[in-house]
Amino acid sequence: MKVRPLGARLLIKPIQEEKRTEGGIVLPDTAKEKPMKAEVVAVGNLEDSDVDIVVGDKVIFSKYSGTEIKIEDDDYIIIDVEDILAKIED
C-alpha cells in the first residue's frame, strides 16, 4: 500500500532503538519511551514551507505529535512539518 500525505505533512517511520539498563537487561517495548527519531518515508506538499526535507532523511520530532498508523504490520506516523525539530545529518 502506498500512502502520500496531504498538505504540509510527512509520513515517517519511527526508528526503534534497543534499550538496555546499566545491568544489561533489555527493556520490553512496554517499558520504552516513545521514539523521537524517524526516517522520512513520504513527503506531502511543502511548497509553502521553508523546510528542506526529502524521502530518506532522518529527523527528530516532538514526542507526542502526529497520528500513529499501521501499514502492513509496520508503525508509521503522519506528522505536520512544523513538528519536525531537526534533521539529522551524517
Swiss-Prot record:
Record key words, sorted: Chaperone, Cytoplasm
This protein's record includes keyword Transport: no
A Pfam family matched in the record: Cpn10
GO biological process, one term: chaperone cofactor-dependent protein refolding
Disulfide links within the chain: none
GO CC annotations on file: cytoplasm
Cellular compartments annotated: Cytoplasm
GO molecular function terms listed in the Swiss-Prot or TrEMBL record: ATP binding; metal ion binding; protein folding chaperone; protein-folding chaperone binding; unfolded protein binding
Chief location of this protein within or outside the cell: cytoplasm
Family of the protein in this entry: Belongs to the GroES chaperonin family.
HAMAP family: CH10
Subunit structure: Heptamer of 7 subunits arranged in a ring. Interacts with the chaperonin GroEL.
Role, per record: Together with the chaperonin GroEL, plays an essential role in assisting protein folding. The GroEL-GroES system forms a nano-cage that allows encapsulation of the non-native substrate proteins and provides a physical environment optimized to promote and accelerate protein folding. GroES binds to the apical surface of the GroEL ring, thereby capping the opening of the GroEL channel.
PANTHER family the UniProt entry points to: 10 KDA HEAT SHOCK PROTEIN, 20 KDA CHAPERONIN, CHLOROPLASTIC
Protein name, per record: Co-chaperonin GroES
Gene of this entry: groES
